[in-house]
């Protein structure tokens, strides 16, 4: 299992993401293909969402990668095999931050949650992402409503919120902690306090830091 989980954007160690990709086959003419999942920002106006996706593309291309968006909304309420086929050609995924509850809903409703968990357990994909893209991997998402609006799921998709995470990690990830330049840093300090009070296992990341998983080796850099 290989994961590059950043607090904000690519963080301070994008070379480590490239290194994780070294074991996933060769690059094509445009670089190593990477699927970009941006459904955590499905609540934003279309033009704003497109600009945000574009900024992710620019950053990933600078690393020699070839990004393509896989919009999970295109696979809502369809057979999981369809999203599996869409993701099959990518040795890596990049899951953008935003609202973790929107992201969780999109992953579940498209069937991408089960597909990604299976790919990770078979070490068939490198999972990269930041903020909500890291948080969604926890066993449970309760507590994050202090920062992200859980009601956004019903407002955007007309469905109830899901509180379960993907369970890939055995602990929660709390980004932007001790990051005064990030507007949600104080809110996430409250999430940490809540987790400590409830005994919820968690790791904190400041902006710039990355949680790296490479097989059995887990480090924060």
Which sequence ranges carry the predicted segments?
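Conserved anion/nucleotide-ligand pocket segment
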Residues: 164-208
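A short, terminal or domain-edge coil/loop segment
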Residues: 87-97, 119-133, 149, 183-193
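Short, well-ordered secondary-structure micro-motifs
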Residues: 47, 105-106, 138-140, 184, ...
